[in-house]
């Protein structure tokens, strides 16, 4: 999995895990979130978006189950459930 610089005021980097269809977003604060069941075509759209921050706000935020990735010794913490 390769990280891509986001060139965005909204977040710093992003990556996509093909094997499990997961999007990873690293925010400028350093926090990393993993979004589950994220379609590859939407990752491609995010990469191509004129404004990745706007795409994130309109197409991703609040629409996917996600978790914050915290220190490995503590494990991930579920922070949102879309009810799926």
Where do the PLM segments sit?
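Acidic/histidine-enriched, beta-strand-rich ligand/metal-binding domains
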Residues: 1-84
């Amino acid at each position: 999995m390769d990280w891509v610089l986001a060139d965005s005021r909204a977040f710093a980097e992003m990556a996509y895990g093909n094997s499990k269809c997961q999007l990873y977003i690293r925010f400028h604060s350093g926090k990393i979130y993993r979004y589950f069941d994220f379609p590859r075509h939407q990752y491609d759209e995010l990469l191509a978006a004129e404004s990745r921050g706007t795409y994130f706000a309109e197409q991703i935020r609040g629409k996917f189950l996600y978790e914050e990735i915290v220190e490995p010794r503590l494990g991930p913490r579920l922070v949102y459930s879309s009810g799926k």
